[in-house]
């Protein structure tokens, strides 16, 4: 399961980020896209895009994909810059606010790294899904990164 978001130049609200209202899902060899993207379509992906843009306004595209350790190994082998966060370190006041975790985790990872990396991941937590976020300047460079990850991963699992 994944989603994709892209922020307008100088985006600062949910409605400035286009995303899919429902997740993109792999079904066998097919990919199901249950709806067309729209501005304000995904609060979760928009929170990540907007937080990233606060640190580097040129990075406007994000795709989240389900975490697994082999994907992290692939990202390392591709020499993608990476940062992570541990949801156990999340302050309680953030944890109880719906939607605040993604902003906190994204900002935490970027601050720890010192710049916006290609990849931000976490291993989840109680009722929190583990996730990898691929970050890029635009949709084309995002697609390029994701396809490289997919191609290398496909060779790994054959």
Where are these predicted regions, by residue range?
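Conserved mixed alpha/beta catalytic, RNA-binding, or beta-rich assembly cores of soluble enzyme
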Residues: 1-158
């Amino acid at each position: 399961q994944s989603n994709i978001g892209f922020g307008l130049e100088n985006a600062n609200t949910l409605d400035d980020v286009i995303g899919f209202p429902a997740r993109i899902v792999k079904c066998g060899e097919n990919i199901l896209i249950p709806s067309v993207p729209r501005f304000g379509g995904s609060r979760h992906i928009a929170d990540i895009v907007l937080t990233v843009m606060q640190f580097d306004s040129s990075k406007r595209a994000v795709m989240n994909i389900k975490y697994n350790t082999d994907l992290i190994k692939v990202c390392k082998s591709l020499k993608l810059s990476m940062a992570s966060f541990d949801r156990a370190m999340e302050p309680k006041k953030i944890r109880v606010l719906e939607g605040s975790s993604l902003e906190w985790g994204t900002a935490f990872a970027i601050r720890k790294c010192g710049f916006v990396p290609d990849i931000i991941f976490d291993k989840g937590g109680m009722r929190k899904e583990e996730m990898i976020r691929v970050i890029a300047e635009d949709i084309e460079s995002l697609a390029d990164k994701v396809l490289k990850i997919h191609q290398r991963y496909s060779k790994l699992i054959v």
